[in-house]
Amino acid sequence: MKITPKIGIDKLIFGMLQKDVEALYGKPSKSFKDEDENTIYQYNALKLRLTFYKDESFKLGYIVGSSPELLLLDKKVIGRPVSEVQKELTSKDFAKWEKEEFDTLENYFNEENWMILQTEFDDVTKVEVGAIINAKDEFEWKFKK
């Protein structure tokens, strides 16, 4: 499954509605509302969690993935040392990373591409990607019907 920064993962494109996602992947393994009333879809087989934002007419705005099949720049990400992944990304508009620590986990956030590499024991365990917010403070939806 290819990660395309600013656009989505695999066939998932930011701005899709729930029905668009279900047409591609079927019903989710689990569906629930978060504390902000956003709809969350969880696809266990794909190891993906999708967030549809309530305030944006339930458009797909955020994806969390932990599948070992996730590819970024045609290379696997999950299970690899974060320093190795970051080194490969530095020349591809991923120069600046902010590090945040939570007990045994670290998050490395790249704002320009709205991506988080979550690590434990220095290896990437999850990748989070979100729709880009432009200078007008509006989402840049990539999905066009």
Q: What are the residue ranges of the model-derived segments?
A:
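Short helix/turn-capping signatures at newly exposed starts of structured segments
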Residues: 1-145
